[in-house]
Amino acid sequence: MAKLRVGLLFGGRSGEHEVSLNSAKAIATALQSGENPQKYDIIPIYIQKNGVWQAGDTAQQVLNDAKPLPCEDATSQQLWTFPPQVSEVDVWFPILHGPNGEDGTLQGLLTLMQTPFVGSGVLGSAVGMDKIAMKMAFAQAGLPQVKYIAVDRAQIWSNPCVFPKLCDEIEQRLGYPCFVKPANLGSSVGIAKVRSRSELEKALDSAASYDRRIVIETGVKAREVECAVLGNENPKASVIGEITYNSDFYDYEAKYTDGMAQMHIPAQLPDAIVTQIQDMAIQAFKAVDGAGLARVDFFYVEDSQEVFINEINTLPGFTAFSMYPQLWKETGVPFAELVDQLIQLALERKQ
């Protein structure tokens, strides 16, 4: 049987470019482990920070080094020129995080190519990226969430008479502390925890510079726990993991600085809470029309035994030390087998 050619697509234009390189390197290693070399050949395809696609030795070198290529602004012609290796791909494994990678835009392009790909489609990716659309989907599915308010940039920037009223509403409905989040950025980029009116005004202005849509959530004193989901129509949930960190909240620095955050797998939780979180993770996955993989994040309030869904990540970090593969390793699915299963799920979904 001929080996499948896996297009490992990495890099991208978002601020999570470097995270993507590390994820891709780990996946490439997994594709060269166990029985995978008998099944798959890797075609590395690197998207530079300017959006230009590279293949061959250039892409392989970036994959080996996990360091981005320097680049200049690209022309329209360069952006619409794909390497010839693209036509050789049997199945895509896109591992681009953030905007233009996991928000449905790339998934739309791969759908037009009529080639199967790992992960959610256009709808699941788009809903899973936009925190406001995601919350609406969760609400429709009856999943408990913390209180929130959704606003847009125009409410913050357009009229000096409107902005104070907006801040009044946030204070009255949510109180302090609360979190201000751009709706469409990953890795906690642009998120601020605020405790006063002045901090709120500053955080809203900052979030509006990142995104047109902004969500403000009430703060809760809770443990942050995560569950991995794997599958298509009949997904499975992993054991639960917990994140603890040495910062005010789980921000970008805490996520990507060694020693600032610790993963506890499995999390020490009552059995009933574990089952509840696993069930909610699968419900959330189905609510956004997920496929292949997702990591679902929760708040567990120990005092009241309440569980609130925080968000879903349809293309989570995939380094050997990332939460998603670690959760499956603890559940009994090692890294190389996990990568194989994801490729098979992509092929199954295309049939």
From Swiss-Prot:
GO biological process per UniProt: cell wall organization; peptidoglycan biosynthetic process; regulation of cell shape
Superkingdom of this protein's organism: Bacteria
Catalytic activity field: 2 D-alanine + ATP = D-alanyl-D-alanine + ADP + phosphate + H(+)
Cofactor(s) needed: Mg(2+); Mn(2+)
Entry EC number(s): 6.3.2.4
Enzyme class: ligase
Annotated PROSITE patterns: ATP_GRASP (PS50975), DALA_DALA_LIGASE_1 (PS00843), DALA_DALA_LIGASE_2 (PS00844)
Positions contributing to Mg(2+) 1 binding: D297, E311
Binding site for Mg(2+) 2: E311, N313
Family recorded in the similarity comment: Belongs to the D-alanine--D-alanine ligase family.
Function noted in UniProt: Cell wall formation.
Name of the protein in its database record: D-alanine--D-alanine ligase
Organism per entry: Rippkaea orientalis (strain PCC 8801 / RF-1) (Cyanothece sp. (strain PCC 8801))
